[in-house]
């Protein structure tokens, strides 16, 4: 089913491009950009710029590699960055990069066609990540993600960039928080920006940090856009991604949050804010800078103090 959907999307995009002239393609791009300024101004654009400003993701003189995977999130991020550059008060540069980890010809063409239709000047570079992780039995998705990031950092640095931008959104953040607690026995979050530990001077930023996934889907559907989903070899022959044997832990967390939301409409916001309201004085242990600390370290010093 997934393979069929991807091919269907490719055919849809190809047919649209073949049956329209350059002016019509320009009009589609203009409509997509207008939707960010009008219909989705509050839910997408304002939350995009809110994250940019709140977490200081973009600074004067930055050269940012906007990483496009081919999905809805990264293409939306690219359009938001183009809009930001048009209106921002200080100069910064953008490079739109696509890593081909071994896409099928159909999936690669979907990405190229979408980039052309949306007027995004992508630069594609090759890697063999899919082949490298195909025979890995334990955590191939985790290994693939780590290898992808390394290749993206490396290529971005070759282009003179000091930052890479990834398309993780608000829902990714709250799901990561719960996954860490329920499956990893740890309290942590997906950070809005990080310094690279392996590529000196490089940073990773997540500009869609405060944008909801449902709003991204609404933007996609409103503009009748078609993007690839997961295009790796592991899902090429998958007939369903919702059965009990194949669904991911992240999908389980999505369903858990949806269930909790039925009785508590604020549950998503509460999860998001929980990592902003951590009281270290109430933790048994915590790690900082790789060093583990215990409440016992300072317990006797607090003797006689008010609780």
PLM ranges: what are they?
Residues 146-159, 193-199, 254-274:
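Short, basic, helix/turn surface patches
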Residues 12, 141-144, 161, 232, ...:
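Disulfide-bonded cysteines in secreted/extracellular proteins and peptides
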Residues 1-15:
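Single conserved hydrophobic/aromatic residue that forms the stacking wall/gate
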Residues 41, 45, 108, 149, ...:
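A structural signal for well-ordered alpha-helical scaffolds and beta->alpha junctions
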Residues 225-307:
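The feature marks non-catalytic terminal segments
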Residues 2, 90-92, 267:
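Residue-level signal for beta-strand positions within conserved beta-sheet cores that form or flank
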Residues 17-187, 191, 195, 214-222, ...:
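ATP-dependent adenylation/nucleotidyltransferase module used to activate substrates
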Residues 93-94, 172-256:
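Catalytic subdomain that performs nucleotidyl-dependent activation
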